[in-house]
């Protein structure tokens, strides 16, 4: 997407439309707080996450069908067809909030802000703010989330907007029908991105500065079970957070596949100290990686363990890994995840599946021409066949994943061939020193460190970190 197109869109949108667009993308660019639409779209463009279809969806969400036709040469029906056939950039939860905001007049919003003072504090938000501003503040206090809409529903009932209360109830029913409960705004978006390889990495690139980090923590941390003294208001007492069971000995298998050769000892020591049985493989080909992953996905030993960890270090493309191969062929990252989904790997259903991937991205000009590997060989078929024999899994197939991907330019290996990845160094240090803290919290701080590093180095030396997760409980990465 060109800068010229982004400029045209930004110039054509009015203030309310810009606000709606920024709100709609809070799940997509959760690691940053863009001050304006131009910066938001530019960030997505730089990350390769602003396709024509993505921009068309955003214009559709703000109902600028004229811009669809004038700038993108698409009509409304074409976008609706695209949305029916493809995962959405904007989560259903964000769409719902935007629709409710459009249906509220100023007096309704003023009444809602007044009612929310019992929960937010008197000076938290001014009467001049919009409904979407109110939702953002409620998210920061963990009072509103994709699976936490009871308070908003109650307040809509109190202002006699039963029509909007009913709309929330219909949304809840649709989420329950999907069979998965998402705990925060990040996870609501992941449900979409997990289903389409072209949208694998819409989330979490690096970490913002400390001020921005604190601004985001409200929608990422667990509900607070104490009063907010700054506002002299009390939040409803929350049910204690449920944790994943992490008591088996060992905690599980930690599979290390290091196709570079710099990380094995560091990673082995780290995960052994956490209580994992470490199994390592060095310098595998693309097909070798696929075969090993397929074998480990089928291991019956998983039924006796409480979790699984996979650390993969390789050269690769933006959405695939090559192993030691030197062609355009690649093992798609979404195929790796698919091997361990609940229906393919039932012994790990309901248990956390933790992936840390360091991918050194190779430009296309450095490789021989070939096609992307489709994983339909013996390893993948074996996984699917065994899953069919065991029957359906009761836990949603995409649940319980923690997927951390770090990409860096392959030239880093040429400059410091024997040096380990900064991402994996920091990760190992945090896991060993702060093992009793939630993994999500550790990763947020890891992102902050990587952001600071990136601000001091050249483009070729930067590390870009993405996090996707569908965790349903708090995850402490050691014995609990």
Swiss-Prot record:
UniProt keyword Signal, yes or no: no
Post-translational modification: Proteolytically processed by CASP8 generating subunit p43 and p12.
Domain DED: 1-73, 92-170
Chain intervals for the UniProt region annotation (Interaction with FADD): 1-227
Gene Ontology biological process terms in this record: apoptotic process; proteolysis; regulation of apoptotic process
InterPro entries in alphabetical order: Caspase-like_dom_sf (IPR029030), DEATH-like_dom_sf (IPR011029), DED_dom (IPR001875), Pept_C14_caspase (IPR011600), Pept_C14_p20 (IPR001309), Pept_C14A (IPR015917)
Record SMART domains: CASc (SM00115), DED (SM00031)
Residue numbers spanned by region Interaction with CASP3: 192-435
Keyword field: Apoptosis, Repeat
Region of interest (Interaction with CASP8 propeptide), ranges: 1-305
PANTHER family noted in UniProt: CASP8 AND FADD LIKE APOPTOSIS REGULATOR, DED DOMAIN-CONTAINING PROTEIN
Subunit structure, interactors included: TNFRSF6 stimulation triggers recruitment to the death-inducing signaling complex (DISC) formed by TNFRSF6, FADD and CASP8. A proteolytic fragment (p43) stays associated with the DISC. Interacts with RIPK1.
Comment, domains: The caspase domain lacks the active site residues involved in catalysis.
Function: Apoptosis regulator protein which may function as a crucial link between cell survival and cell death pathways in mammalian cells. Acts as an inhibitor of TNFRSF6 mediated apoptosis. A proteolytic fragment (p43) is likely retained in the death-inducing signaling complex (DISC) thereby blocking further recruitment and processing of caspase-8 at the complex. Full length and shorter isoforms have been shown either to induce apoptosis or to reduce TNFRSF-triggered apoptosis. Lacks enzymatic (caspase) activity.
Protein name (record): CASP8 and FADD-like apoptosis regulator
Organism: Pongo abelii (Sumatran orangutan)
């Amino acid at each position: 997407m060109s800068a010229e197109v982004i400029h045209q869109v930004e110039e054509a949108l009015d203030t309310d439309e810009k606000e709606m667009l920024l709100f709609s993308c809070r799940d997509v660019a959760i690691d940053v707080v863009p001050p304006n639409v131009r910066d938001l779209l530019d960030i997505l463009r730089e990350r390769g996450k602003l396709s024509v279809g993505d921009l068309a969806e955003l214009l559709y969400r703000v109902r600028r069908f004229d811009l669809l036709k004038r700038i993108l040469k698409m009509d409304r029906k074409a976008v609706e067809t695209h949305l029916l056939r493809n995962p959405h950039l904007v989560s259903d939860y964000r769409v719902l909030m935007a629709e409710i905001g459009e249906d509220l007049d100023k007096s309704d919003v003023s009444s809602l802000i007044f009612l929310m003072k019992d929960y937010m504090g008197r000076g938290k938000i001014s009467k001049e703010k919009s409904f979407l501003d109110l939702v953002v503040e409620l998210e920061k206090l963990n009072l509103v989330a994709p699976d936490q809409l009871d308070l908003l529903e109650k307040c809509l009932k109190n202002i006699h907007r039963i029509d909007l209360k009913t709309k929330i109830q219909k949304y809840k029913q649709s989420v329950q029908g999907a069979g998965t409960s998402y705990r925060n705004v990040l996870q609501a978006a992941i449900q979409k991105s997990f289903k389409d390889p072209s949208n694998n990495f819409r989330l979490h690139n690096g970490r913002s500065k400390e001020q921005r980090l604190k601004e985001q923590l409200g929608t990422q941390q667990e509900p607070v079970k104490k009063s907010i003294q700054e506002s002299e208001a009390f939040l409803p007492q929350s049910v204690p957070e449920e944790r994943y069971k992490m008591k088996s000995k060992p905690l599980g298998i930690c599979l290390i596949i290091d196709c570079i050769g710099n990380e094995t000892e560091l990673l082995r020591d780290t995960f052994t100290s956490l209580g994992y049985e470490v199994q390592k493989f060095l310098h595998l080909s693309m097909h070798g990686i696929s075969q090993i992953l397929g074998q480990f996905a089928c291991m019956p030993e998983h039924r006796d363990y409480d979790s699984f960890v996979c650390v993969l270090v390789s050269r690769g493309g933006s959405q695939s890994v090559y192993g030691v191969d030197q062609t355009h062929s690649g093992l798609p990252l979404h195929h790796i995840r698919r091997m361990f989904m609940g229906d393919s790997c039932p012994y790990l259903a309901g248990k956390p599946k933790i992936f840390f991937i360091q991918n050194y991205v190779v430009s296309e000009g450095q490789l021989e021409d070939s096609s992307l590997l489709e994983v339909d060989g013996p390893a993948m078929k074996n996984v699917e066949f065994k899953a069919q024999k065991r029957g359906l899994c009761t836990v949603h197939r995409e649940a319980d994943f923690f997927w951390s991907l770090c990409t860096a330019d392959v030239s880093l290996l040429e400059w410091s061939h024997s040096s380990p990845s900064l991402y994996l160094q920091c990760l190992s240090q945090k896991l060993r020193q702060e093992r009793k803290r939630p993994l999500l919290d550790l990763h947020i701080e890891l992102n902050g460190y990587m952001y600071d590093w990136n601000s001091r180095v050249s483009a070729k030396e930067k590390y870009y970190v993405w996090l996707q997760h569908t965790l349903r409980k708090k995850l402490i990465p050691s014995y609990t």
